[in-house]
Amino acid sequence: MAGLKLQAVTKSWDGKTQVIQPLTLDVADGEFIVMVGPSGCGKSTLLRMVAGLERVTSGDIWIDRKRVTEMEPKDRGIAIVFQNYALYPHMSVEENMAWGLKIRGMSKAHIEERVREAARILELDGLLKRRPRELSGGQRQRVAMGRAIVREPAVFLFDEPLSNLDAKLRVQMRLELQHLHRRLRTTSLYVTHDQVEAMTLAQRVMVMNKGVAEQIGTPVEVYEKPASRFVASFIGSPAMNLLDGVISASGDRFELPGGLALPIGAGYRGHAGRKMTLGIRPEHIALSSQAEGGVPLTVDTLEILGADNLAHGRWGDQKLVVRLAHQQRPAAGSTLWLHLPEHQRHLFDGETGQRV
C-alpha cells in the first residue's frame, strides 16, 4: 500500500486565473477519499493532475513517499477507471484485462495468474471469453476495474465510473466498490458529482467548489457540521434549509424578514447586528403546536415519497422544507406548527459563508 500527498497544488490554464486554488491533501495508506462537487468545480482536473494527464502549475504530488510531480503517468504507480469503459471491442474480457500487462512485457504465466485472480474477485470467471458487446453495463464496468486491478497499482483513481449506469446498477456497483476496497485496501481517490456515492463510499469526503476544498472530513462530519454555507447546501437530500437574517441587537435572537425571530442563546452577543444565515435540515425540524410556542408554516405543496413526505412552505420570501413521517400528509394551505431544535441549528457568516 502507499499514501498520496498533494502539497499546495494549483492549476491555471492562462497563468492568471487559478482553477485549482492552493490545495493540500494527505491520503493515508489504504484510505478511500471521495472528491465531490458540482460540474466545473475542479475535481476531475485535480484527479488528472494526480494521474499526470495534466501538468501541475505549482506545488507537489507525492505517491508512496516519492515525488511524482513531473513523472510520466506510466511511472507513477497509478491505475485509472474512467466514466467510459474504453474496452477494446474486438478483444475478449480476458484479453482486455491482460493487455496492459502484455505490452509491459510481463510473462504469460504471470499475466494469467493476475487476470484469473482479478476475475475471481470481480465475479467475472464465467465471462472471460466474451466480447464487450455481450456484456451488460455493470459487467463492462467490472472489466474496466479488473483491467486496473491486475496492474496492482499503488493508487486507484476513479473518474465518475458509475455515471453511465442506471440507478439500480449504480446502487449495486457502489456495494461492489465497497467490498472491493475492503478486500484490496488500495489507496483510492474517487471523483463524483453524486453526493450519495460520496457519502456511501468515502472514508473521508473532500467537498469542492470553484477550485477550493471547502471541507475535508468524514461523511458524518460534513453532514453534521458543515464548514460553510456551500457545504450545507450541497450535502444532504433535500438540501439544508438556509434562512437569511440578522442577529438581534441583544445578540440572543435570530431575526428574519417579516418580524419572525428565533431564540439562539447568549453565545452570539459578539455578533449583534451582523447578517447571518441560519441552517437547519428538513429532517431535524419537529412538529409542535401553537401552545408550545411553535412557529407557523403554511404548506404550499406536499411531496409524497413513500417512506416519508416533504412539506414545502415559505417564511416571507424564504423557502422552508420539512421532512414528515409517512402518515403525516398535511393538505396544501394548512398550517404546520414547527419546533427548530437549537442544537440542530447552524449559523453561517452572511458575508464569507463560513460556519460561525
From Swiss-Prot:
InterPro entries: AAA+_ATPase (IPR003593), ABC_transporter-like_ATP-bd (IPR003439), ABC_transporter-like_CS (IPR017871), ABC_transpr_MalK-like (IPR015855), ABC_transpr_MalK/UgpC-like (IPR047641), Mo/tungstate-bd_C_term_dom (IPR008995), NA-bd_OB-fold (IPR012340), OB_MalK-like (IPR040582). Its EC number is 7.6.2.10. One of its GO terms (biological process) is carbohydrate transport. It is an enzyme of class 7 (translocase). One of its GO terms (cellular component) is ATP-binding cassette (ABC) transporter complex, substrate-binding subunit-containing. GO terms for molecular function: ABC-type glycerol-3-phosphate transporter activity; ATP binding; ATP hydrolysis activity. This is sn-glycerol-3-phosphate import ATP-binding protein UgpC. It comes from Salmonella paratyphi A (strain ATCC 9150 / SARB42). The lineage of its organism: Bacteria, Pseudomonadati, Pseudomonadota, Gammaproteobacteria, Enterobacterales.
